[in-house]
């Protein structure tokens, strides 16, 4: 079997075990058995448990980002782009629950080196969402200009909400990717639409 195919099998097994048990509780013996190889071969190919976990994080992050980008068309309005991106995001996390568990929860509890990998992925997604919100502001009627700081904050809030919603949706088999995406659009875009049109919530006096 080619080395690349063997490594893919090992990483598939790693994602499943890490996703279910977490980094610290995961056993290289279990990963090797699930992959159908010897434990020494796992170490020969992927060096260490830490390196295997890092490789799993990077692979799953790249796959998620690729899925979201592939799902978005650039020739449609910004709200449709966001809808397409959210649908692709929730479809991917539903189809790869262990991969999402690795990215969203297990990597964050594994320590600084792993957290840094997830932060890099999240920053790329936030940058993508930031560009969509900025585009929506440019497309809007009235006074569409939003401060750069405000756009960045809105993107952070939207991504954080989508991450939380993915965890909820994956815990309920009755929730489809489209339903999760629609929930997110109703929560986020309805408010963003008003904001783009110049309707803002009035901050109360500090008294």
Where on the chain are the PLM-derived regions?
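Short secondary-structure transition hinges
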Residues: 51, 84, 91-128, 141-152, ...
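Histidine- and aromatic-rich ligand-binding microenvironments
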Residues: 52-71
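N-terminal intrinsically disordered/low-complexity leader segments
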Residues: 1-5, 137-146, 196-207
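Amphipathic C-terminal alpha-helical segment
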Residues: 91-95, 99, 131, 135, ...
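Amphipathic alpha-helical packing segments from all-alpha helical-bundle domains
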Residues: 62-65, 112-139, 149-156, 179-190
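Hydrophobic alpha-helical connector segments
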Residues: 55, 70-98, 148, 158, ...
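Helix-turn-helix
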Residues: 9, 13, 17-51, 55
